[in-house]
Amino acid sequence: DLVVVKGTTNGTITDFEGGFTLNVPSNSVIVVSFVGYKSQEISVAGRTDLTVTLKEDTQLLDDVVVVGYGTQKKEDLTSAIATLSPKEVLKSPGGITDALQGSTAGVNVSGGKIRIRGTSSITGSTDPLWVVDGIIDASGNIPNDNEIESIQVLKDAASCAIYGVRGANGVIVVTTKKGAEGKPKVSFNAYAGFGSNTSKVDMLNPYDYAVYVNELYYNSSDANAIANGTWNKTVPTGVANPSNPLGSTDWWDEYFSNTNYQKYDLSVSGGSKYASYRIGATHADNDDKMHTEDVKVDNIYANVQGTVGRFTYGGRIFANYSRTNGFTGASLMNTLQTPSNLPVYNEDGSFFLTGNNGRDGSDLVNQIWFLRNEKLRNRSISALGSIFGEIKIFDWLKYRLTYTYSFARNNDATLIPEHDLGTANGKQAYNSQTTTKGGSGHEIIENLLTFDKTFNDVHTLSGVVGVVSEKFDGWSTGISGRSNEYASFGPESRFPDSQNITSSQYNEAYFSYLARVMYSYNSKYMITANFRADESSKFKKGNRWGYFPSFSVGWRVSEESWMKDATSSWLNNLKLRATLGWIGSANAVGRYDYQSVVVTDNRYYTFGPNQINPEGTASNASAPLIENFANPDLSWETTRDAGVGFDLDMFNNKFSLVFDYYN
């Protein structure tokens, strides 16, 4: 904290505990200030002991925006970046995803999918890139909503091009809370709630359903037979009959049920002048709306950072363990197609087994049986570790090296017991288990050189240059088998009959150069240029490099003297912006599409009797097969993004408007 006598240069700095001593005249006014807090003026009035409490300046905190590989003053931004308040996230039961809907222009959320300014790939993924505490592709590493400090949405090429191929669909940048100098602070939050499906499909009751089915049969019968009076009006076997209803079932209510959830999170933070920390844990327990799953999730996390002289260091760890137990296999569509006059259970409590659906003779299986009997089990663990070291070469020049590694392991299993549901498609004379195991790893190494220099108090030049490498690897194994002995989850050896084993493995890599330069004249005229060069292993040599530049300019009209003279009483900020950029994407291309892929499969070969010898039978043998042919011309998808816009703040920042037009 800085303490000065108002109107003078007489001042001092507080100590570690916030105390200070300053010799002043008895009628002085002192000004106490600290970065991120509102300054406070206090009249001494002859006193020798003062207690001062500063309030957080939320407006000032909003003035610094996290951008790609750095931060920037909001007033100097020339690109389309939206900020979402963490308070809005806490108000939304669905977290960040739901909070973005309707609160951020150009962002559409539907079915849990986020789309920033529409679709940017023809066939590939259109999900945005998540960057958490500077770590790319880390959407699953946010401990809980209470740990969020800031959220920025990068929407245009001018802001996303610095991420190259990874930022083709927009970028969501999340910064989590860090520890601060001071005594340990403990925070605990507990949540509990319930939910229900309020949007219900209105279905016909049994009588109306039977009438409509009979009408269907009447209207679809042979016209000549009806004209000649030979049409048989007897209801076909198995078809709903108004005079003989079997029951009255609301299949929607049978399929869905209420949701109950609870969540707890605990955090501890603190530190000294040399190091600070924030550690915590979260537990969540949730069952879904189809009484099929109970999901439990636990995570632990820690953030540590410190400064010694010109050297700054830090690290972040996050680990997550989730387990799901429940049932699966039921189809909502098939459930709703089940006639409402059919019951779920027989009088003895056993499941009612249906035959055809009463309309076209198609097999109809009691879907509620699957909700009670087809078992699902999932176990997954993921972890991330990141460390960095930063040295201040000069006051205006820093070098940072960051290493991040994350991995995930999963074990999924599905068990279907022996059953006979009364139809050809509803019979299985054995117990079957399918197990899928997999793992993945992701390594990131970043070398960044950042600079920020001001000349003659009005010319500011800042930016970053760097080299980034990424490696991905993964594997999966699937085993399915049958057993007439075991009807519960167990090792694969319990299900030895008709075993089928599949496996796969992959590797993927990127190597990138990046640069951003921003020039500002007195925070009035701004220009920013970004450049990213990406090399991807998805393409053949010769096509692997993609080059993606972007440019943006800004003009703060409100800082012009002629504008200030006319509007100073009500206009706080008016900034015009224009952007142009190109972003690349490799999402639509498979890892090995540029090469011929050979697989082993069973095919008919002329090793024995064949078509040449009609009296024999073709031989079915396992042999190599080209699954797809090489396409060496595959290259990058490229999106060109151009836009103009303005930012307007009026009436002491009580009214704000952001407008963007883009193509």
Where would I find each of the regions flagged by the language model?
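Short proline/glycine-enriched turn/loop segments at secondary-structure junctions
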Residues: A161-G164, L332, D565-T567
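Extracellular/periplasmic, surface-exposed regions of secreted and cell-surface proteins
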Residues: T126-D127, Q262, V297, N303-Y321, ...
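Short, small/polar-rich motifs associated with maturation and membrane association
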Residues: D1-Y301, Q305-T307, F311-G314, L384, ...
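Extracytoplasmic gating/loop element in the C-terminal half of outer-membrane beta-barrel translocons
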Residues: T237-S243, G422, D497, S536
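C-terminal beta-signal and adjacent terminal beta-strands/loops
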Residues: S196, D253-Y255, N334, S569-N572
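A surface-exposed, glycine/aromatic-enriched loop/edge motif typical of exported proteins
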Residues: V201-T234, N320-R359, T414, D473, ...
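Short aromatic-centered micro-motifs
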Residues: V32, W130, V344-Y345, Y519
